[in-house]
């Protein structure tokens, strides 16, 4: 079976694979971040969101994997075999967990649409030859908070901006009213 854990969230394993493996923080740092930001929601019996559910499952699976790793470490007597198992877990499974934890924590922190736009932007940036791309990669935290991803189809008609009108010297509204309307 070929199961993509990101599909229902609008992303794919391939989209996350554009990010280099050293991009993702350690599992310990990601678990600490999830705990600091979302402990109450993760421990709650209430359903919060699909991202919370996925994060809960990833955290539980990581715990089980660490239990297995401890068992292997205690019961596998050959040091070379033990090192191979630990290396495999850290390299392959560790990266998958780091990607999964990062994705769901980022979606909860920045919003799913922003994270997906970031992944697409980074994917475009990394595939563009160095001579033709900006020197710095996109950064997730600097993307606008209200990013609009346009659907394919008719593009909206562009309007030319109207010339600015000169303001009269006598204000029509009192200042206190204009401040209230900005909320």
UniProtKB/Swiss-Prot annotation:
GO terms, molecular function: DNA binding; RNA binding; structural molecule activity
Residue numbers bearing the Phosphoserine modification: 155, 162, 170
Keywords of the record: Capsid protein, Cytoplasmic inwards viral transport, DNA-binding, Host cytoplasm, Host-virus interaction, Microtubular inwards viral transport, Phosphoprotein, Repeat, RNA-binding, T=4 icosahedral capsid protein, Viral penetration into host nucleus, Virion, Virus entry into host cell
Location(s) in or outside the cell: Virion; Host cytoplasm
Region feature (3 X 8 AA repeats of S-P-R-R-R-[PR]-S-Q): 155-177
Residue span of motif Bipartite nuclear localization signal: 158-175
Region (Disordered), start-end ranges: 136-183
Record's keyword annotation contains Cytoplasm: no
Effect of residue 170 to A: Partial loss of replication
Pfam families: Hepatitis_core (PF00906)
Compositionally biased tracts (Basic residues): 149-176
Swiss-Prot/TrEMBL GO biological process terms: microtubule-dependent intracellular transport of viral material towards nucleus; symbiont entry into host cell; viral penetration into host nucleus
Modified how: Phosphorylated by host SRPK1, SRPK2, and maybe protein kinase C or GAPDH. Phosphorylation is critical for pregenomic RNA packaging. Protein kinase C phosphorylation is stimulated by HBx protein and may play a role in transport of the viral genome to the nucleus at the late step during the viral replication cycle.
InterPro entries: Hepatitis_core (IPR002006), Viral_capsid_core_dom_sf_HBV (IPR036459)
Region span, RNA binding: 177-183
Repeat positions for Sequence: 155-161, 162-169, 170-177
GO CC annotation, single: host cell
Subunit structure: Homodimerizes, then multimerizes. Interacts with cytosol exposed regions of viral L glycoprotein present in the reticulum-to-Golgi compartment. Interacts with human FLNB. Phosphorylated form interacts with host importin alpha; this interaction depends on the exposure of the NLS, which itself depends upon genome maturation and/or phosphorylation of the capsid protein. Interacts with host NUP153.
Family that this chain belongs to: Belongs to the orthohepadnavirus core antigen family.
Biological role: Self assembles to form an icosahedral capsid. Most capsids appear to be large particles with an icosahedral symmetry of T=4 and consist of 240 copies of capsid protein, though a fraction forms smaller T=3 particles consisting of 180 capsid proteins. Entering capsids are transported along microtubules to the nucleus. Phosphorylation of the capsid is thought to induce exposure of nuclear localization signal in the C-terminal portion of the capsid protein that allows binding to the nuclear pore complex via the importin (karyopherin-) alpha and beta.
Protein name from the UniProt record: Capsid protein
Organism for this UniProt entry: Hepatitis B virus genotype D subtype ayw (isolate France/Tiollais/1979)
